[in-house]
Amino acid sequence: MFGIIVGTHGRFSEELLKSCEMICGEQKNVKAVTLIPGEGPDDVVKKYEAAIQELQENGCDGNVLFLNDLFGGSPYNAACRLVISNESYGIVTGVSMPMLIEIISAQMADDGSDIKDVMAKAVEAGRNGAQTFHASSVADEEEDEL
């Protein structure tokens, strides 16, 4: 089973994980890593390494998906430092609740997907999770029904 590390600016990762756990239940193989004011990429790398150790102790197979908030941000840059030397790691940016729920579901299914397949699922879930609604949409639907 692959591990998931959600790395973000501030406490967003912790709260996002808590919100997803309301739907998916407690997740032992998902770790939240924060970048708080005063910390830099070196601090985040250390937190990532500790999270990876915990994931391995929980039985993860060595594949790790980093879900970061911003491309080019410090949590992303810190993850890059680890991913560059390990082909079983990957990063997807733009983490959202629909994305994390989809990836937790894929993790629970444990279908043997490699990290690149999981990354593609994450990107698709992120795209599909962004939807729109406006009052004119309802009016247009009502007109179509007449």
Region roles according to the model:
Residues F2-L146:
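N-terminal loops that bind phosphate or other acidic moieties
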